[in-house]
Design a protein with these regions (language model features):
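Plant-biased, solvent-exposed loop and capping regions
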Residues: 1-411
Length: 411
């Protein structure tokens, strides 16, 4: 009699939780039925109704896993924690031409990571990011990515600001437009913010200065304009800052030198001006610095280059720079591999000490007003080959050993 009561008790518990019975019978941790149905429906919205999850993947968190779906145990039951849609692998979930964000996707309330890669591509069926229900994922979602979706149009939903646990927001290579919502600056846990390769306009929000945990900020290849806010100096944890290929103007704020941990600073292809007034020497963690194609101007020799020991890549071409090429570059930048100073207004002699930089493998100084004679060794010219260029300096003399190297290469 006692065993009979136990049997009915177990059956009632299984019924209450709506479990997948096949899993329970095998002694495997079960999945809540509503969770499984929500997963199947959410995927169908992207890949099509032909996709019959219950037949193809009856145990999506167990012995019939779905490519792009990961699960984890919570209180003894399986829940979906990662959902990746798009052709990352041969057997990945691929989007149909006409996709839909079904409400069931937002019922996966243990979801930590959600990504869409090369999914929204149809010319005839443009897609916008839903502006509703994201708050249902606020307690779990840590990573959200829309990558390489050319027909993903519209604006960044302001409701994203409710995703307080978000650590990574990547909206890269899409067709998104409009201004970046200032409310994104309220996502205090963000460590990576990548909005590159869209058509965003307007200014960078001042509120971004609140993102003190941010490690990577990439807003490159948009149409952002206006001034770079001084609050950028508040991103004290930042390692990489890429604002290249925008329409930004004005002086680079001195506060940017507060970013002591920065290893990459890329401001190429904007319209920054106002001279080299940033104390770059204080940014002694920099490994890559690219300021080219900005009418910044200023004297190249005013920077204490000898203090920038970790620089590997330095591109200061097309910047209207004046003055001489300082010997302090050779004295301090022992790790430097790439140096481009071409198409400026630099004058004076080119110091042979530049040859003493042990790692340098590319040096470009064409298009300046350099004078005197090049005094590098044959070995230096052989080492750099075509990666050395000093053309279009009208008063610069080229020694015979350099001419022979050029004639040999041109053959």
């Amino acid at each position: 009699m006692k065993s009979l009561r136990t049997f009915f008790f177990v059956i009632s518990i299984l019924s209450l939780h709506g479990l997948c019975y096949g899993e329970a019978e095998n002694g495997i941790a079960p999945m809540v039925k509503t969770e499984q149905e929500a997963l199947y429906s959410a995927i169908q919205g992207f890949v099509g109704n032909w996709w019959n999850g219950s037949d193809l993947y009856p145990d999506p968190c167990g012995w019939t896993p779905i490519q792009g779906v990961s699960c984890d145990l919570f209180d003894g039951f399986w829940y979906v924690t990662d959902l990746n849609i798009g052709p990352l692998h041969d057997n990945s979930l691929r989007c149909r031409q006409k996709v839909e964000f079904r409400p069931e996707m937002f019922e996966l309330n243990h979801l930590k990571s959600l990504s869409f890669f090369n999914c929204f591509t149809s010319l005839h069926h443009p897609v916008t990011i839903p502006t509703y229900s994201w708050e249902k994922l606020a307690s779990s979602l840590q990573s959200l990515e829309f990558r390489s979706n050319p027909r993903l149009n519209g604006k960044i939903p302001t409701i994203f600001s409710l995703l307080k646990k978000l650590q990574s927001l990547v909206l890269m290579e899409n067709g998104l437009t409009g201004q970046i919502p200032p409310s994104i600056g309220n996502l205090a846990n963000l460590k990576r913010l990548v909005l590159s390769g869209n058509r965003f306009t307007g200014q960078i929000p001042y509120s971004f200065g609140n993102l003190t945990e941010l490690l990577i900020l990439d807003l490159s290849r948009n149409s952002l304009s206006g001034y770079l806010p001084s609050t950028i100096g508040g991103l004290i944890s930042l390692l990489k800052l890429d604002l290249s290929s925008n329409l930004m103007v004005g002086s680079i704020p001195r506060e940017i030198a507060n970013l002591k941990n920065l290893t990459l600073l890329d401001l190429r292809n904007n319209s920054f001006s106002g001279g080299l007034k940033i104390p770059l020497e204080k940014m002694d963690s920099l490994e890559e610095l690219a300021l080219s194609s900005n009418p910044i101007g200023g004297d190249l020799g005013k920077i204490e280059w000898r203090d920038m020991h970790k620089l590997v890549f330095l591109d200061l071409s097309n910047m209207d720079l004046t003055g001489e090429v300082p010997e302090s570059m050779a004295e301090g930048m022992k790790q430097l591999r790439y140096l481009d100073l071409s198409n400026n207004n630099l004058s004076g002699n080119l110091s042979p000490k530049l040859e003493t930089m042990p790692c340098v493998s590319a040096l470009f100084v064409s298009g300046n007003n350099l004078t005197g004679e090049l005094k590098f060794s044959d070995k230096f010219y052989e080492k750099l080959g075509r990666r050395f260029a000093a053309w279009k300096n009208p008063n610069l003399c080229f020694p015979m050993n350099y001419r022979k190297q050029v004639e040999f290469r041109l053959g």
